[in-house]
Each structure stands twice: as C-alpha cells, then as structure tokens.
Amino acid sequence: MAKERSAIATIKGYYYQFDYFILQLLKCNNETDSICIEGIEDVDLKTVDESTAIQCKYYAGTEYNHSVIAQPLRYMLDHYLSKANNGIKYKIYGYYKSGQDKLILPINIEFFKSNFISLKAFKGLSIEDKQIISFLSNLEIDIAAREFEQQETDIFNEL
C-alpha cells in the first residue's frame, strides 16, 4: 500500500510540474519568450530580460526540511559554477504540507553552507565564498507555492 501511495504522490508531482509549465506558457507576454520543460531544470523560462531555471516540487504529504531542497540546490550551484557569468537565474518552487517557517529568507552564505552543502561536497567543489554569494544573488526560493488545486484554478483563470 505504501508503494501505491508513493507512486500516486510522484505522479501528482509530475502533473504539478506540467501544470506549472502550462501556467508559465499562458503568462508569456512576448512572442519571443520561450519555455522548455526538462531543460536545465524542470521548467526553464527565457524572456528578453532574463533566463530562469526552475525546479518544481510538490510534497503535499511532507513537512518542509532543508534536506528536501538541498540536492536540487547543489545541482543548481554546480550548473552555475560550470557556466560562470551565464546570466541564468535559479528558482526552487515548491509546495509542502507544513514547515515553511523553518526557512527564513533571504538566506546568507553561512546558512547556505551549513544547511545545503555537505562538508564533503563543499570540499570537493573548491568554491570560494564570493562564488556562493554570487549564486545566492541569482537564486529565488519559494517553498510556499500554490497547492495543486489552486494552481489548476490559476490555469483556468488564465484561459
């Protein structure tokens, strides 16, 4: 029974991601804007002004903990470091059952290093603090995203 619930939650997460993609597509204001699903991240938005790589998370049955977004943040940081000065913004967009009060925004470098980068991973990166600070200036975290049905309503309202 637990696997069935897990599969249902996973499928709902994919629907949530796809709905987010559709919503962003409907919100495009310019014919030169582009949206890619499963590009750098789950949803990549490119406008005249900026490019944003967005990781979507839907955990309706999960309390938010820093560990839930740590791995996606490390992937984003790794991408940022490999594409230095690429101008890409990064975003975590997620819905969680509870626990949003655990993350106080904006996050600073010490908090980022102690909660999102393991010591082993940090040593392997050979990264300077100024690079992390630069990455953080290009990062947005929204862990109070719209609930599944609310996001669907947003789509219908855009139509």
Tell what function each PLM region has.
Residues 1-8, 59-159:
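Acidic metal-coordinating catalytic centers involved in nucleic-acid phosphodiester chemistry
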Residues 7-11, 15-78:
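Catalytic centers of nucleases
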